Structures are given as structure tokens and as C-alpha cells.
Amino acid sequence: MMTAIAIHPEVLRDVVAAALGDKARSVTVALGEVTVEVSAAQYLEAMQVLHTAPDCRFEVLVDLCGVDYSTYAEVGREGPRFAVVSHLLSISLNQRLRVRVFCTDDDFPVVASVTSVWAGANWFEREAFDLFGIVFDGHDDLRRILTDYGFIGHPFRKDFPLSGHVEMRYDPEQQRVVYQPVTIEPREITPRIIREDNYGGLH
């Protein structure tokens, strides 16, 4: 049964910090939401604590995704390129938490799988592997889940071309689907210019 009133974010921050101890690199509140950052080395252990600790009891993994922070350097951020972000829900305590863990190696990003804690992480982790190339150590079936068989690359990485590398079409002579280099021609996008304040009746 869920509690009627959600815990205050600042209180949840303190509860999470106390439960994780030195496993938490930081616990912050922004826009009424609590985010905890943990190290890759202690990620699985921290998630187990968040799942079972009496004041946490995050029974549900709502979402898990990869993030590519490579363009954040343009605004002065330094640090690892890839992170895994999870959103947890405690039904019994009516509280939510965001967990972020950075992969230590940009060339071969790896974090532990949390499928042993939440079985529902299975497809989430496969999606993050497929789209970002993040490897989840301990996942027993880490196959692509969205892209085609034989797909090369990871399309949500920010250095992956928007048009992709290949396209597929049906070849009537061979009577099968074939792959070929992308034939989309690059085009320049001209920004819309509003010439007067009430142009198009928008103002």
C-alpha cells in the first residue's frame, strides 16, 4: 500500500545519503527531484541498497537509459562521456529517485547490470547497449533490441551521422532486401527569418 503523502525532496536526499554512505558521490535536489550519483565500481551494490533499505524500498525500476555527454564540453563540462541514468519508484513509500553512474572508459563503456535487482532492467539495458554501445557486465543476453541484424555502430551516439551509414531496399532482380551506401544528399537548412513583428499573425 502506498503512503498518502510523498516524502519531501530534502528529506529523501538525507535518507538516500544515509543509506548509501560513501557509495554516494553526491546527492542533490533540483526542481523538486533527487539525483544520486554513484561510481561504476559501487553501482550494483548501491542499487541493491536502494532496493532493500527500509527507508528506501525502491521496488520499481521505471526507466534506465544511456546518455552521451560528449557535446557538454562546449559549455565547459569535463568528465566521462557516457552515463547510465535510472529512475526508481518506491510504491510503498511514495517516493522517486534518479540514479546516475558514469562509465570510466569512453572507448569501451561498461557498468554492472542490475537485472539481478530488477528483472525489468533486461530490455532497458539491451536498448542502452544497442543505441549507445554501453556494455552491462553480468547481463545474460546482451543483444541488440531495436536496430537491424548486422547493424554497425550505435545510432544515439552524438558522433553517429543523422543519415546513418547504409540504407536498405528491396532488389527485384535478387528478390531480397539489400544494403547499400546512403544516397541521401546533404542539404543546407536555412533558418526562418521573421521580417516584421506580426509576420504570419504569430504575435
From Swiss-Prot:
Highest taxon of the lineage: Bacteria
Which reaction is this enzyme known to catalyze?
A: a quinone + NADH + 5 H(+)(in) = a quinol + NAD(+) + 4 H(+)(out)
Q: Which PROSITE patterns match?
A: COMPLEX1_30K
Task: Assign the protein's first listed, main location to one coarse class.
Answer: membrane
Query: Which keywords does the record carry?
Result: Cell inner membrane, Cell membrane, Membrane, NAD, Quinone, Translocase, Transport, Ubiquinone
Q: GO cellular-component terms in the record? A: plasma membrane
Q: Which GO terms describe its molecular function?
A: NADH dehydrogenase (ubiquinone) activity; NADH:ubiquinone reductase (non-electrogenic) activity; quinone binding
Compartments annotated for it: namely: Cell inner membrane
Report the InterPro entries cross-referenced here: NADH_DH_suC (IPR010218), NADH_quin_OxRdtase_su_C/D-like (IPR037232), NADH_UbQ_OxRdtase_30kDa_su (IPR001268), NADH_UbQ_OxRdtase_CS (IPR020396)
Q: Does the keyword field hold Transport?
A: yes
Membrane protein topology class: Peripheral membrane protein
Please state which protein family the record places this protein in.
Belongs to the complex I 30 kDa subunit family.
Subunit (UniProt): NDH-1 is composed of 14 different subunits. Subunits NuoB, C, D, E, F, and G constitute the peripheral sector of the complex.
Query: What this chain does, per the record?
Result: NDH-1 shuttles electrons from NADH, via FMN and iron-sulfur (Fe-S) centers, to quinones in the respiratory chain. The immediate electron acceptor for the enzyme in this species is believed to be ubiquinone. Couples the redox reaction to proton translocation (for every two electrons transferred, four hydrogen ions are translocated across the cytoplasmic membrane), and thus conserves the redox energy in a proton gradient.
The protein's name: NADH-quinone oxidoreductase subunit C
Native species: Delftia acidovorans (strain DSM 14801 / SPH-1)
